[in-house]
Amino acid sequence: MAHKMNVESFNLDHTKVAAPFVRVADVKHLPAGDTLTKYDVRFCQPNKEHLDMPAVHSLEHSFAECVRNHSDAVIDFGPMGCQTGFYLIMIGEPDVSGTCELVETTLRDILKLNTTPAANEVQCGWGANHSIKAAQEAAHTMLNHRDEWEQVMA
């Protein structure tokens, strides 16, 4: 990388990370005094593996719904275009350990679901493109590596 780019993740050397992990991707201090922290919640090793779209889509719906049972600080949970993880945006200063606990609790909730929340054409733009089973498999794999989440670099 010759020069610093505007997008934080474009400055991350994806060949040097060891997924899965949770890391602070950005912190914004807003004019009114609030702080937003964006976390990179990485499920898959970049350029080696990825989540299939139905898994991504069901993880997005399930996590977004379940996480709000545990925290009012969640702003958004959205997928990365590369399909290797998600961005979790929260109100507050960075707290990787606390966020890892929140992610763990939420993924455990997802394992208990029978269906993907709002996976229908009334509540979703592509209601047929879901797989709760694939989402749960990805959640299970992520949870199996829980002790590694705070170690980002290989």
From Swiss-Prot:
Fe cation binds at residues 57, 61, 124. It is an enzyme of class 4 (lyase). GO terms for biological process: quorum sensing. One of its GO terms (molecular function) is S-ribosylhomocysteine lyase activity. Gene3D superfamilies: S-ribosylhomocysteinase (LuxS). Keywords: Autoinducer synthesis, Iron, Lyase, Metal-binding, Quorum sensing. The keyword Iron applies. Its EC number is 4.4.1.21. It catalyses: S-(5-deoxy-D-ribos-5-yl)-L-homocysteine = (S)-4,5-dihydroxypentane-2,3-dione + L-homocysteine. The keyword DNA repair does not apply. Its cofactor is Fe cation. Pfam families: LuxS (PF02664). Binds 1 Fe cation per subunit. It comes from the Bacteria. Homodimer. Belongs to the LuxS family. HAMAP family: LuxS. Involved in the synthesis of autoinducer 2 (AI-2) which is secreted by bacteria and is used to communicate both the cell density and the metabolic potential of the environment. The regulation of gene expression in response to changes in cell density is called quorum sensing. Catalyzes the transformation of S-ribosylhomocysteine (RHC) to homocysteine (HC) and 4,5-dihydroxy-2,3-pentadione (DPD). This is S-ribosylhomocysteine lyase. The lineage of its organism: Bacteria, Bacillati, Actinomycetota, Actinomycetes, Propionibacteriales.
